[in-house]
Amino acid sequence: MMNLKYLLFFCLVQALHYCYAYGDPSLSNELDRFNPCPYSDDTVKMIILTRENKKHDFYTLNTIKNHNEFKKSTIKHQVVFITHGFTSTATAENFLAMAEALLDKGNYLVILIDWRVAACTNEMAGVKLAYYSYAASNTRLVGNYIATVTKMLVQQYNVPMANIRLIGHSLGAHTSGFAGKKVQELRLGKYSEIIGLDPAGPSFKSQECSQRICETDANYVQIIHTSNHLGTLVTLGTVDFYMNNGYNQPGCGLPIIGETCSHTRAVKYFTECIRHECCLIGVPQSKNPQPVSKCTRNECVCVGLNAKTYPKTGSFYVPVESKAPYCNNKGKII
């Protein structure tokens, strides 16, 4: 039933794509007339996690200084923002698992952005899929919110931009991109990295760089492609990893029907790449289907937090298995 709903969702979104402008709410007067998923700073929440404090309490811009880390004069952690997508939440199991993997890996300050109201998560189950266009139009506003928190970190807590990384899934990937644009507009500099996990395709894949996540949004933009309907095969970043060619992920069933599974696999893949060094290896598209066993550090790239330490950029094919940890490298590390 859920797969049928998403199949209908594809058709609806593609029709709406020709009726409305997306990515910038100022471009669409029609969306302003009736918005069932309105954006407000007050409805965006943050879960702030460290190794010492893993409570899933919610904070806002007004209450963030109640958190112990924000009572200090300086924050010395590397900071990672995680942003969910359409009809999801920061408390979804896959995002909490990613946050936990980060904390196991290093002494990070993890900020999960919960914009469920503007992402239409709270709407009636049978109706909210029709509201995708409203959530898409809110992404820039949520990106501006992340930029506001970033400004606080930089100016009040002496966090260098080089210590801040953004991770976003689906619409959350574009939200992260808009945050990257906004911090540059505020003259804060660039984020060290933005990681887009299967960035949403509908409403964005045909847009110019200013209206979607783009390689100029951070010093390094890593994109993981896992679906070609909910996601996109368009190259967007410094490096673009096409997992199993970017669609129909192993273990997700038939094309289209398994699209939702493929779309969410991006989060699972990246979480495994946090847990396991060089879990998944990207082979240059020009050399596909070269086996990863022939890869060297100078031509291939490992997906994950260390991707930017490799010299190669561009598009990469990544073979994956159907079950966690999804590695197809037979223990090879480059």
Curated annotation (Swiss-Prot):
It comes from the Eukaryota. One of its GO terms (biological process) is lipid catabolic process. The keyword Secreted applies. Not glycosylated. Gene3D superfamilies: alpha/beta hydrolase. Its EC number is 3.1.1.32. It catalyses: a 1,2-diacyl-sn-glycero-3-phosphocholine + H2O = a 2-acyl-sn-glycero-3-phosphocholine + a fatty acid + H(+). The keyword Hydrolase applies. PROSITE patterns: LIPASE_SER. The active site is at S170 (nucleophile), D198 (charge relay system), H263 (charge relay system). It comes from Vespa affinis (Lesser banded hornet). It is found in: Secreted. Catalyzes the hydrolysis of phosphatidylcholine with phospholipase A1 activity (3.6 U/ml). May act as an allergen and induce hemolytic activity. In vivo, a mixture of this protein and Ves a 1.02 is able to paralyze crickets. Residues 1-23 form the signal peptide. Belongs to the AB hydrolase superfamily. Lipase family. Keywords: Allergen, Cytolysis, Disulfide bond, Hemolysis, Hydrolase, Lipid degradation, Lipid metabolism, Neurotoxin, Secreted, Signal, Toxin. This is Phospholipase A1 1. InterPro entries: AB_hydrolase_fold, Allerg_PlipaseA1, Lipase, TAG_lipase. Loses its activity after heat treatment. Residues 24-33 form a propeptide. One of its GO terms (cellular component) is extracellular space. Expressed by the venom gland. Its main location: secreted. Pfam families: Lipase. Disulfide bonds join C37-C120, C209-C214, C252-C261, C278-C302, C279-C327, C295-C300.
